[in-house]
């Protein structure tokens, strides 16, 4: 190899430690793993690092629901995550947790450097306070008697019994749900990172080639609106790291999450003993650092993270690579349809190599969504991997073993193999640029040529003629050498198959030995390497992924149950199920002020089954909206998206807080809801006409 060795650190976004991995997550880990494996095949020093993102309110609340400590929950989730990744052949060099001493030390050190440099500001906000427990109380921790219907044990701003909303001060006999004490209002100080101070650096960095062009252009909107200071603190109770010199204040999860890359790498360095942490993270580092992420967390990694690193005197990433979402059969993953498929459910039914190849065949360097069409999935895997690749060996290997003592021939014409080897730099460039789909097409085009050669030469006919034994030997030897070259190119994508091929060919598949002379090379007897995708197993996987909507036994009579409204049966025709409403005047329509809004923040709402709390940025004006879309979206899938909102809807007080508008969504409900997303070019604050 003529190229010089590179020092590379590559990461995938940290999976959140409150639930299982699903096939949407797996896109990123497969994409990154392929890139990491390719770099190692090329002889570079490449370390693939990841960790569980193990802090935040959702984890704290879920642990409380389970009746266990958050530490116990995240430890169990980490075991499950690591097993799923291992079974998908995702080869991390280190997988750690953000809830680690390495991460605590690094987060504190970075914060102190930012603070001492004047990049941390403080602001005062007011919250409910428990004087006995000395803790600030979210609404869910204040209870009392409803001032309307006099029902006991109601939350501070909403009554579950009568549906009334009211001010916390109107609650009769208010008490802390933690201690029973009467709460008071008290000011609390929050800490903010001074992001605007880094505007010049960020503008230069995002247009330096470190980001995909569409990502860089999208981030321009943040500068047009004006960068805002970023709240990096949360009050107890909170599961995370306490802020230095600020008792009761905790780092917001998104501060220590990206530092988790560094924490895991520091843990890895300690395990290895021969890798210097500072060689990769110091300001003057010449190593390369790459983050693979989903498009929903671009602004955290491309604004906050590089600014934090700059302010702390550390190096910034070489590049941040974003990918799109996964849809299944052309639609958002759905539990009711069985297309919200967990990694473990997939592994219980199908070979992980299938999905690795299918994702690779559809991945590019762009931020496009990827559709896992299950019918196309089966057809493509069966055609490409079984029909073209493995079939090349299965049709020819038997003749070598049975008739020619398991040894390849001295080939007189190597032109076909030489033409395949000549493609190595083209394929390498595609892998390097994350254009995996182009690489797969190039490889399969060669597989077509190889199979065409075998079909034309028909060794099964040649072996019948005693005078053509040498020709049959040579044809089969050429075919197996082509099979070896093709599998070498596919090794980053298909590691398990590559191991089987290495055992069969009795040599290691490396980039350096692509041109190896295979004369008289001995092979092992051929064994079946890959089965066709069984559509019955695909159907069983989908069925196993469906929510069981039917109760296992008849429910007992319940007054509350009598009040529940059953979901209406639908025909599947939107206009039949939901006819067009009566006409309104243009004047009535003109009263609506529809605006483009950026979802700056999305959060779960404690004790709310359907609601997400959204902070919507209208280009200088921020509105808080409670949206009934929890069944269809996770908060992390929404942040950074543009949507459309009704901006002039009268504020409505809810038990969880004030809702100042409404986001627009389509669909019958449940997990079949889709928020409206404007095309690129639309900007927060623009009126929808």
UniProtKB/Swiss-Prot annotation:
EC number assigned by the record: 6.1.1.10
Keyword tRNA processing in record: no
Superkingdom of origin: Bacteria
Amino acids binding ATP: 335
One GO term (biological process): methionyl-tRNA aminoacylation
Binding site for Zn(2+): 146, 149, 159, 162
Domain tRNA-binding: start-end pairs: 588-689
Keywords: Aminoacyl-tRNA synthetase, ATP-binding, Cytoplasm, Ligase, Metal-binding, Nucleotide-binding, Protein biosynthesis, RNA-binding, tRNA-binding, Zinc
GO molecular function, one term: methionine-tRNA ligase activity
Pfam families registered for this protein in UniProt: Anticodon_3 (PF19303), tRNA-synt_1g (PF09334), tRNA_bind (PF01588)
InterPro entries membership: aa-tRNA-synth_I_CS, Anticodon_Met, Met-tRNA-synth_bsu_C, Met-tRNA_ligase_1, Met-tRNA_synth, Methionyl/Leucyl_tRNA_Synth, MetRS_core, MetRS_Zn
Reaction(s) the record says it catalyses: tRNA(Met) + L-methionine + ATP = L-methionyl-tRNA(Met) + AMP + diphosphate
Motif ('HIGH' region): 15-25
Cofactor note: Binds 1 zinc ion per subunit.
Entry's Gene Ontology cellular component terms: cytosol
NCBIfam families (UniProt xref): metG, metG_C_term, PRK00133.1
Protein name: Methionine--tRNA ligase
Organism from which the protein derives: Shewanella denitrificans (strain OS217 / ATCC BAA-1090 / DSM 15013)
Lineage per the UniProt record: Bacteria, Pseudomonadati, Pseudomonadota, Gammaproteobacteria, Alteromonadales
Encoding gene per record: metG
């Amino acid at each position: 190899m003529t190229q010089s060795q590179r020092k590379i650190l590559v990461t995938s976004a940290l999976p959140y430690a409150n639930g299982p991995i699903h096939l949407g997550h797996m896109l990123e880990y497969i994409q990154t793993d392929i890139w990491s494996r390719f770099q190692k095949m090329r002889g570079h020093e490449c370390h693939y690092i990841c960790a569980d993102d193990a802090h935040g309110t959702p984890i704290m609340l879920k642990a409380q629901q389970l009746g266990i400590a958050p530490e116990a929950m995240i430890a169990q989730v980490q075991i499950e995550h690591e097993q799923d990744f291992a079974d998908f052949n995702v080869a991390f060099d280190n997988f750690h947790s953000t809830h680690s001493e390495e991460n605590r030390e690094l987060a504190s050190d970075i914060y102190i450097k930012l603070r001492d440099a004047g990049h941390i500001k403080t602001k005062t906000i007011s919250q409910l306070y428990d004087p006995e427990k000395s803790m600030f109380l979210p609404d869910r921790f204040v209870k009392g008697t409803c001032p309307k219907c006099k029902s006991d044990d109601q939350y501070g701003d909403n009554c579950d019994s009568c549906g009334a909303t009211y001010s916390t001060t109107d609650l009769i006999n208010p008490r802390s749900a933690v201690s029973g004490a009467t709460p008071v209002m008290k000011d609390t100080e929050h800490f903010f990172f001074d992001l605007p101070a880094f505007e010049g650096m960020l503008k230069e960095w995002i247009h330096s080639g470190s980001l995909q062009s569409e990502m860089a252009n999208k981030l321009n909107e943040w500068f047009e609106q004006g960068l805002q200071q970023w709240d990096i603190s949360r009050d107890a109770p909170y599961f995370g790291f306490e802020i230095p010199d600020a008792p009761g204040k905790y780092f917001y999860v998104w501060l220590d999450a990206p530092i988790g890359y560094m924490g895991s790498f520091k843990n890895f360095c300690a395990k290895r003993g021969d890798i210097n942490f500072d060689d990769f993270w110091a300001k003057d580092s010449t190593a390369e650092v790459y983050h693979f992420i989903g498009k929903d967390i671009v602004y955290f990694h491309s604004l906050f993270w590089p600014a934090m690193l700059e302010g702390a005197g550390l190096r910034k990433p070489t590049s941040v690579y974003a990918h799109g979402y996964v849809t299944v059969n052309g639609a958002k993953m759905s539990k009711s349809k069985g297309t919200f498929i967990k990694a473990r459910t997939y592994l219980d039914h199908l070979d992980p190599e299938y999905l690795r190849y299918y994702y690779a065949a559809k991945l590019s360097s762009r931020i496009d969504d990827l559709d896992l069409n299950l019918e196309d999935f089966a057809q493509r895997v069966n055609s490409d991997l079984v029909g073209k690749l493995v079939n090349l060996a299965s049709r020819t290997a038997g003749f070598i073993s049975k008739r020619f003592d398991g040894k390849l021939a001295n080939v007189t014409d190597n032109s076909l193999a030489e033409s395949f080897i000549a493609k190595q730099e083209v394929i390498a460039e595609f892998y390097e640029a994350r254009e995996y789909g182009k690489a797969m097409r190039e490889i399969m085009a060669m597989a077509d040529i190889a199979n065409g050669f075998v079909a034309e030469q028909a060794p099964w006919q040649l072996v019948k003629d005693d005078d053509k034994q040498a020709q049959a030997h040579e044809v089969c030897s050429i075919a197996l050498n082509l099979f070896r070259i093709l599998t070498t190119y596919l090794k980053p994508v298909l590691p398990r198959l590559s191991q089987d091929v290495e055992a069969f060919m009795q040599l290691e598949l490396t980039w350096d030995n692509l041109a190896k002379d295979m004369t008289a090379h001995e092979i092992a007897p051929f064994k079946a390497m890959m089965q066709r995708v069984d559509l019955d197993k695909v159907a069983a996987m989908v069925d196993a992924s469906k929510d069981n909507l039917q109760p296992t036994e008849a429910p007992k009579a319940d007054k509350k149950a009598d009040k529940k409204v059953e979901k209406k049966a639908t025909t599947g025709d939107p206009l039949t199920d939901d006819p067009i409403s009566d006409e309104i005047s243009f004047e009535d329509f003109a009263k609506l002020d529809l605006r483009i809004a950026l979802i700056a923040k999305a959060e779960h709402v404690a004790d709310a089954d359907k609601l997400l709390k959204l902070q919507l940025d209208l280009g200088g004006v921020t509105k808080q909206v409670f949206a009934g879309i929890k069944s269809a979206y996770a908060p992390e899938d929404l942040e950074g998206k543009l949507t459309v909102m009704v901006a002039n809807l009268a504020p409505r007080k809810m038990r969880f807080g004030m809702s100042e508008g409404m986001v627009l969504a389509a669909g019958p409900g449940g997990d079949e809801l889709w928020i409206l997303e404007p095309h690129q070019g639309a900007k927060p604050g623009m009126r929808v006409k």
